[in-house]
Amino acid sequence: MPPITFESLLQAPYRPPDVVTDPFDGLTPDWIWWAKTAPSSKGSNKRAPANQNAIATDVRSEEQTVSQQSSRDEVEEILVCVIHGGCWSADFDRVHLRPLCTYFADQGLSSVLPEYRRCGDQGAGWPGTFTDILSAVARAKALALKRGARLVVFGHSAGGHLALWLNAKGLGCSADHLGDRETFEFDAVVALAPITDLEAYGQGSGSCQVMVEALITAGEVVNPRDISPRFGETWSKELVIAAALDPIVPADQTQGYASERKGECIVMEGIGHFDALLPGHPACESLAQILSDLVSRDGQPVGARQ
């Protein structure tokens, strides 16, 4: 099977989000897809049907939708905050992940897909891009707490970099300079083909690699090491996934990151950079299962632990 292209993601079918929130701070709204079934654990095909009468469509108010959702069957919910990639460039927005979020919902995973300022947008770079991510995930956490759901932060490529940055403490320019300890407690952080060392990655000449310079100079000029998760410590449980045939973010970068940190790494054999994002591809099915299994290893939703 040939590697999946970015254009394949744009052409894949999807459902519109169940919720389009009000814009935050004048930025674009969050898009939310509610799970249409209950999440399953590994080795089980059980899918508890949701109360379809409680599924919101064309809803503008998140508060109203949360109220409507209270009549759903009492099942443990997983909420995935999906951070899209695209080389931190304004040329690539979140729309290519609408099919993935639709698929997640069909597999029992609710998802929120925020947007953030990217190079070419006013206010991008440090700190704008990063505070947008911090704010988006804080909103997702508040929603997860309200619903008693498990929260997974998931990012792909440049979005994987931002997810891991959010989960890294002690960097020169890290999220823990912008919030308190509780802000960074999630059930899990998962990064697919993440860019983990900007200094090393930016030495290449690929179309995504050259965007490192744009990212570190778009706002306040920062040292790439100061926003590279490789040089920080983790707040919450973390898993990285490498695509063995990835020409954009080589698998050895992801594997090296996990090895240095003695963290978890899964290598998906025989796939490229975008394969796991396309519904219908076996790697996409594996990704959804990984997210479900990861948060089922311990017992309680975020915020409920002692």
Residue ranges and their predicted role:
Residues P2-R47, A54-Q68:
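N-terminal cap/lid segment of alpha/beta-hydrolase-fold proteins
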Residues E74-V75, V80-Y103:
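Short, surface-exposed "cap/lid" segments of acyl-processing enzymes
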Residues T234, V240-A242, D246:
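Short beta-strand/loop motif that positions the catalytic acidic residue
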